[in-house]
């Protein structure tokens, strides 16, 4: 999230995604100023190439902001960009990278907290990605996450909302990119 949102996040006791030190430190400073501790979930980029701390940098990132008494790591997550595709090779790479980041964090005595990764497609296809929590997405509206996946038998009504872009970046042409 943009740093300008930290006041609202703290006011409404919301738990944001953290993947940049600028945002983390702004959140921590404001929380400390208000006498609060801001809980956050660390986004790990395991290959989606949209948001997140590169999986091999998770420990260094946590250490770089871990001194802050206004911050508390509550959870760690990734997003599987290709869990809905017919082939699973990229999903397997992402899962391996995420598991590696988690293991490195634990080896460094950093508790990853609530671990979550499974989106709608991964819930349907990959129980090994369940971890501590599931993130039901489009399937919650009764829709299949992809044409090759079932979805629910009785689709519910759903609404589309217009939102602002939260991140833009240039990636290699061979990289997989998904929504979050």
Predicted regions and their residues:
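Active-site loop/helix belt of alpha/beta enzymes
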Residues: 22-33, 37-39, 46-172, 177
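Generic signal for short, ordered secondary-structure residues
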Residues: 3-6, 44, 77
